[in-house]
Swiss-Prot record:
InterPro entries: PSII_PsbH, PSII_PsbH_sf. It comes from Synechococcus sp. (strain WH7803). This is Photosystem II reaction center protein H. One of its GO terms (cellular component) is plasma membrane-derived thylakoid membrane. PSII is composed of 1 copy each of membrane proteins PsbA, PsbB, PsbC, PsbD, PsbE, PsbF, PsbH, PsbI, PsbJ, PsbK, PsbL, PsbM, PsbT, PsbX, PsbY, PsbZ, Psb30/Ycf12, peripheral proteins PsbO, CyanoQ (PsbQ), PsbU, PsbV and a large number of cofactors. It forms dimeric complexes. PANTHER family: PHOTOSYSTEM II REACTION CENTER PROTEIN H (PTHR34469:SF4). It is a single-pass membrane protein. It is found in: Cellular thylakoid membrane. One of its GO terms (biological process) is protein stabilization. Keywords: Membrane, Photosynthesis, Photosystem II, Thylakoid, Transmembrane, Transmembrane helix. It holds the Pfam family PsbH. Belongs to the PsbH family. One of the components of the core complex of photosystem II (PSII), required for its stability and/or assembly. PSII is a light-driven water:plastoquinone oxidoreductase that uses light energy to abstract electrons from H(2)O, generating O(2) and a proton gradient subsequently used for ATP formation. It consists of a core antenna complex that captures photons, and an electron transfer chain that converts photonic excitation into a charge separation. Its main location: membrane.
């Protein structure tokens, strides 16, 4: 038998929608938008690392903090 805890009682309302499926696409388009934004973020980081994206006046040194 599961033990009841105060934390479990506080979190129970968050789990009240468990098993229910929203008809249609739901929040899938929002997830897609965030995935694309994250991909763009990763591409910018990669380009900064490869120095293929050069920002004027900003020196990027990957040799360490010293």
């Amino acid at each position: 038998m599961a033990q009841r805890t105060r934390l479990g009682d506080l979190l129970r309302p968050l789990n009240s929608e468990y098993g229910k499926v929203v008809p249609g696409w739901g929040t899938t388009p929002v997830m897609g938008i965030f995935m694309v934004l994250f991909l763009v973020f990763l591409l910018v980081i990669l380009q900064l690392y490869n120095q293929s994206l050069i920002l004027e006046g900003i020196n990027v040194n990957w040799n360490g903090a010293g």
